Amino acid sequence: MTVPQQGQCLDVVVVGGGPAGLTASTYLRRFHRSCRVLDAGHSRARWIPESNNCPGFPDGVAGEVLLQRMRRQAESFGTGFDAVRVECIERQDGRFVLSA
């Protein structure tokens, strides 16, 4: 995969830094895949005052706190982040090229 503004070729680019994207990026890095998360910063999880269906939080957790902790964990494995909105994904020469 190619991130045009950086010219980087990566195993995976995760579009979206919500709980699913952060979980994916953590596992990808744990399995030694090169990975970046591109996130516009509009995760719906931020709106959740208290989520009671997240493993490890039996008393619930605020969405913002959950995102902060998940991002810290992803960063601890070397996940890179870019605060951008992905506008287009195209396949070119056997690769995916993202425009942000």
PLM region spans:
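Conserved beta-strand segments of alpha/beta enzyme cores
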Residues: 34, 80-82
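A conserved short coil-to-beta-strand element within the FAD-binding core of flavoproteins
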Residues: 82-96
